């Protein structure tokens, strides 16, 4: 089931602000483009605080989309995050964006269904 189309819009938006396709990024530079939920990183920060997520934590994000929350958690809290996404195109782009942010050691992207993971 494909819920989101045009996942490459993130790359288009990054180009529009002067970022080349292979240029290194920070997780915060992606924030305006990769949060596919309400309230952006503010809601993620609240969840991190309430769940007491830290560098010692391991987090499973189900329905990770483009990986925005996973990268934000890894970058700000230092936690290890497994980002599980059903859509192959979103998962592939999320993995590339995470690599550009040098967070691949903290964030592991997996394409799969949470019912069988």
Where are the model-predicted features located?
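Conserved adenylate-forming
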Residues: 23-24
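Short, flexible segments with low predicted structural confidence
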Residues: 18-20, 30, 45, 69-70
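Conserved alpha-helix/loop element of class I SAM-dependent methyltransferases that forms part
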Residues: 20, 37-55
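Class I SAM-dependent methyltransferase Rossmann-like catalytic core
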Residues: 28-38
């Amino acid at each position: 089931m494909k819920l989101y189309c045009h996942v490459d819009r993130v790359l288009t938006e990054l180009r529009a602000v002067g970022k080349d396709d292979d240029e290194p990024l920070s997780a915060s530079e992606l924030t305006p483009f990769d949060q596919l939920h309400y309230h952006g990183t503010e809601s993620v920060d609240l969840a991190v605080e309430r769940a007491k997520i830290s560098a010692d934590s391991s987090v499973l994000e189900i329905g990770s989309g483009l990986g925005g929350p996973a990268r934000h958690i890894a970058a700000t809290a230092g936690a290890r995050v497994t980002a599980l996404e059903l859509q192959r195109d979103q998962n592939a782009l999320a993995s590339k964006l995470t690599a550009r942010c040098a967070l691949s050691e903290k964030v592991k992207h997996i394409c799969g269904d949470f019912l069988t993971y």
